[in-house]
């Protein structure tokens, strides 16, 4: 038997609302009233905070007053402290004092001392421990006897050429280069020597500048009067022409004497020769000119007329079409322009 399956119908749930915008009417108060209420709340909070601040200030004042109650007798011990009067403590100025101060004249000269290895060996070792390696690893010896102690400057085992040339490396205290500190007096002497030379050069430059200014300035007695020049255009052009350099042309002078080979020619003979030259005009033609042998005919050109098309065989009749014979066309000869009979209107 087939199982019966019950189909549940789709059920929808909903609620009906009379006015969906009815909830917006709950806040009908004026916005200005809300702002005024917020301002009053802030003022009340400030009033509550003010007494708290005053109480904290009074507590701090009380602490200071308790400290001030302590009285200290003066160092002499002879004075008496009156009741009701407080003794004010003077601040003690603690100054850091160094060794004795020297004036410029009493200053000792600065010197740099270099200890020799003898002093280093005789002097006891500084610090907590003694020399290196005196414990279980065996006795230790200083690495180099030519320099300072082990905690001072580092000394290398080998110097360039010092072992071979038997020249010990000494500290440089003059000149230039690395490890050259010099002395303070050397630096001061260089500044003192350089400053007067600079002052002398500046004085010389100022004197030279004053001299040049005096030469360039015009004398006060001479009065310079500047007047603007006014002129017309023609005058300006004349000045320009005067200042313009003149161009020299190499012109040959005419000779006044008559040459011996000169011949007088009469004008009438020249006119007769010119008339004869105009009449006797000859056109030269090359030997290979063919234009004289050509015939020119004016009229209709020989154009073949369109004839009828030959018949074509229909479908199934594939026979070749026979060519049609055309009768020769006769054309009239062109009129001769020299013959007056061809052109009777011109006669």
UniProtKB/Swiss-Prot annotation:
GO terms for molecular function: ribosome binding; RNA binding; translation elongation factor binding. Residues 307-319 have a biased composition (Gly residues). Residues 199-213, 338-347 have a biased composition (Acidic residues). It is found in: Nucleus; Cytoplasm; Cytoplasm, Stress granule; Nucleus, Nucleolus. Keywords: Cytoplasm, Nucleus, Translation regulation. It holds the Pfam family HABP4_PAI-RBP1. Transmembrane segments: none annotated. Ribosome-binding protein that promotes ribosome hibernation, a process during which ribosomes are stabilized in an inactive state and preserved from proteasomal degradation. Acts via its association with eef2/eEF2 factor at the A-site of the ribosome, promoting ribosome stabilization in an inactive state compatible with storage. Plays a key role in ribosome hibernation in the mature egg by promoting ribosome stabilization. Ribosomes, which are produced in large quantities during oogenesis, are stored and translationally repressed in the egg and early embryo. This is Intracellular hyaluronan-binding protein 4. It comes from Danio rerio. The gene is habp4.
